[in-house]
Structures are given as C-alpha cells and as structure tokens.
Amino acid sequence: MLNQKYVYLVAVGHFFCDIAMGALPAILPFFILYYGMDYSAVAGFMFASSFLSSLVQPTFGWLADHTSKTWLMSLGILLSGVAMGLVGLFEDYWSIFALVTVSGIGSAIFHPEAARIINKLSGAKRGTALSIFSVGGNGGFAVG
C-alpha cells in the first residue's frame, strides 16, 4: 500500500536538495561577470558538482542497501543547501570549488537513501511513488 503522506514528504526533501543543483548553472554567468573567471574555470564547478559527486554516490548507495540510515537524507539536504548558500560569501576559485563539491556530495548522500525509502513506501505502486519523488527533484532543479 502506497504511504502517500511520506512519499510526498520525501519528494519535498528531494525538491530542497535539488534546488542547490539547479542553482549552480544559473549562477555560473555571475562568476564570469563579477569575478572575472573564464568558461573553463566555471566548467570546473560543474565538474565538481556532477562528476565528483557521482564518484562517491555508489558508496552511499551501498550504505543505503546495507544499513538503514534515514538521517542521511537530512544530512544530504543540509550539506547541499548550506554549501551552495555559502558560495556567495567567497570570491576565490578554490573555496567556491570546495563548497560546490560539498554541495554535490550532499546530493550524493541524499539520493540513494531517499530512493530506498521511496521504494519501501511505495507498496505495489512503485511507478507512482517514483514519479512523485521525481517531480520533487525536477521542481527543485527548475526553481534553483
């Protein structure tokens, strides 16, 4: 049986986690305009956010499969949002790179545990639950 209330709650968490991931492409032009960075420099931020977080995500997937750590979802949302929010306080490249990396790792922490929870909450309606979860993430990315 679909536990609709909690599926929507996890989808809201997905929304807030993915706001940070959607914000990064939107702020790249500001780094170029105000900090004098070039396109290859800001491409490094996308590398930090996407590629580096993808490298560690399987580790958190393994952890989600072997231990139930639902608090990892909260940690992931917190890291993702706070680190991306702190980006605006720094002007030097490597500080921003580090914060973007931490934000991406927050996203990598959130997604496997959240996917595990969605599967558990879905009952026989896995497609419906996953769709609701996905709408949350896509909405967050769009708002970001």
Regions found by a protein language model. Name each.
Residues 14, 46, 50, 77, ...:
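Small-residue-rich transmembrane alpha-helices and their cytosolic helix-loop interfaces
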Residues 16-24:
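Conserved extracellular-gate-facing transmembrane-helix segments in secondary transporters
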Residues 22, 50-58, 141-142:
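Residue-level signature of mid-helix packing/kink "hotspots" within the transmembrane helices
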Residues 24-36:
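Membrane-interface helix caps of multi-pass secondary transporters
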Residues 36, 68, 89-94, 123:
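Helix-breaking motifs and short loop linkers at transmembrane-helix boundaries and internal kinks
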Residues 55-91:
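Conserved MFS/SLC helix-loop-helix module at the cytosolic interface between two early adjacent transmembrane helices
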Residues 83, 94-102:
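Paired small-residue
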Residues 99-136:
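Cytoplasmic helix-loop-helix junction between adjacent transmembrane helices
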